[in-house]
């Protein structure tokens, strides 16, 4: 099966880099799924986005991202964000508490982490 190279980079670290068969996330224009040989585009991610990376023969990666941008070429997807956490790094209780915050930015970050954990649609 064809693959595309995916890089997810936060301000302080490269979170993940590798090959994937499909990438899904939410942009300000709506949900998007990216397969190899997708048309080139640049899009802004919503503040409470979750990125799902499907890999052949491996479990999907679920990553909470705090805003940022998505760049797509025929061979690669690059996601540049302020902050990001892999599903395995997320504290569910802290994410739930943040999602209930009166501060919209904190609440969005909490929702993104809950989405990555599969606890919010």
From Swiss-Prot:
Transport among keywords: yes
GO MF term set: ATP binding; proton-transporting ATP synthase activity, rotational mechanism
Membrane topology: Peripheral membrane protein
GO cellular component: plasma membrane; proton-transporting ATP synthase complex
Compartmental location: Cell membrane
SS bonds (residue pairs): none
PANTHER family per record: ATP SYNTHASE DELTA/EPSILON CHAIN (PTHR13822), ATP SYNTHASE EPSILON CHAIN, CHLOROPLASTIC (PTHR13822:SF10)
Function, as annotated: Produces ATP from ADP in the presence of a proton gradient across the membrane.
UniProt family annotation: Belongs to the ATPase epsilon chain family.
Quaternary structure note: F-type ATPases have 2 components, CF(1) - the catalytic core - and CF(0) - the membrane proton channel. CF(1) has five subunits: alpha(3), beta(3), gamma(1), delta(1), epsilon(1). CF(0) has three main subunits: a, b and c.
Protein name (record): ATP synthase epsilon chain
UniProt organism field: Mycolicibacterium vanbaalenii (strain DSM 7251 / JCM 13017 / BCRC 16820 / KCTC 9966 / NRRL B-24157 / PYR-1)
